[in-house]
A protein has these predicted regions:
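Positively charged, amphipathic and often flexible ligand-engagement surfaces
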Residues: 1-174
Length: 174
């Protein structure tokens, strides 16, 4: 952090959230650009957003890929919107990481005049057309590249999400 290199902390399952957030807040006290992923489907996220704002920690808002406090797809979308509204009203830059076309379109509508305050993040290999189209339209776009020994579990969570979308008659952005 002392060299000014941006540092991002991903979020894992619910049992690790408290310790992960405490670590991020401790690191934030040492300075340097720090971002942490916060999950919309956890009841604690409103408080975590406030703690991050107080500490100057940037947020990458995700819906969540583990078992959270909220399991209903539509309810998670609503929580995502609520948390995004909090981030938007803060006027601090943030990242939205979702492949949900409903949420992406909603955010684009909300942020059209403030493109500099939002970055959209997508998983490598998904939404390539959307990434290219959004970048060409002036949106900040990032690609998340997962790595590490937990590939099978990671892939399983993404497959479960895509299956859920299919059952709802939806699909991720192209």
């Amino acid at each position: 952090l002392d060299r000014g290199v941006p540092f991002e902390i991903d979020m894992e399952g619910r049992p690790l959230v408290g310790d992960t957030l405490r670590s991020a807040l401790t690191l934030a006290g040492e300075g340097g650009p720090l971002t942490i992923a916060l999950q919309a489907y956890l009841n604690r996220t409103s408080n975590d957003l406030a703690a991050c704002a107080d500490a100057g920690v940037s947020v990458r808002l995700v819906k969540g890929a583990y078992h959270g406090d909220i399991g209903d797809f539509i309810a998670i979308q609503e929580k995502f919107r609520t948390h995004a509204e909090t981030l938007i009203s803060s006027a601090a830059p943030f990242c939205a990481a979702t492949h949900d076309p409903v949420l992406i379109d909603w955010l684009k509508g909300k942020m059209q005049a403030h493109k500099n305050l939002i970055e959209f993040a997508f998983l490598k290999g998904l939404a390539d057309g959307t990434k290219t189209e959004m970048a060409a339209a002036g949106w900040k776009v990032a690609e998340y590249v997962p790595y590490g020994p937990a590939d099978p579990a990671y892939i399983l969570r993404r497959e479960r999400y895509l299956t859920t979308l299919g059952h709802l008659g939806r699909s991720p952005v192209p």
